[in-house]
């Protein structure tokens, strides 16, 4: 949360670069970039750091989510994730913030006290497909969300920030 937006933009660039490079590798089915902040969540390093997990399969939770998005698309012709975001925008009750490129909202069935989902306004499948403005907007939103979360506590909060991607096409 203390990093300037320009440094968080570097994190977004790293996610996008690694996604693009790993996507070229044979046998990779799921890419999972994430950042860890704080020993409270079980990290062994005291400083914030990122990693990228790459799987030769789609993890069970992601597989289930893909099945739901595909079934929804077959039934309605729509994009489940986009329709959820639009419903959240219409209701307006759980919107945390919005900028030109992204919407941050608390999901209806949040599993954690400070859980926030960040969704792109434009249909994109992977981080490397983001344009320059979207990358800056994501870095800016990420900064604001971290600061808002930390405002609830006397110490910085420990948290993971994750983006699950898959090589399978999601119906847009």
Question: Residue ranges of each PLM-predicted region?
Answer:
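HIT superfamily nucleotide-processing domains
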Residues: 1-172
């Amino acid at each position: 949360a203390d990093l300037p937006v320009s440094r968080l933009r570097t994190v977004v660039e790293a996610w996008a670069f690694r996604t693009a490079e790993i996507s070229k590798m044979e046998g990779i089915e799921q890419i999972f970039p994430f950042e860890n902040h704080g020993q409270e969540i079980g990290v062994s390093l005291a400083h914030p750091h990122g990693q990228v997990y790459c799987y030769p399969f789609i993890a069970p939770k992601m597989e289930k989510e893909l099945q739901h998005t595909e079934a929804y698309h077959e039934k309605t012709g729509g994009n489940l994730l986009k329709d959820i975001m639009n419903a959240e925008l219409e209701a307006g009750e759980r919107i945390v913030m919005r900028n030109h490129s992204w919407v941050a909202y608390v999901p209806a069935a949040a599993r954690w006290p400070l859980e926030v989902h960040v969704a792109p306004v434009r249909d994109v499948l992977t981080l490397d497909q983001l344009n320059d403005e979207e990358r800056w907007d994501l870095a800016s939103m990420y900064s604001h969300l971290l600061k808002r979360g930390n405002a609830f506590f006397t110490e910085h909060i420990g948290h993971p920030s994750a983006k699950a991607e898959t090589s399978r096409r999601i119906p847009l």
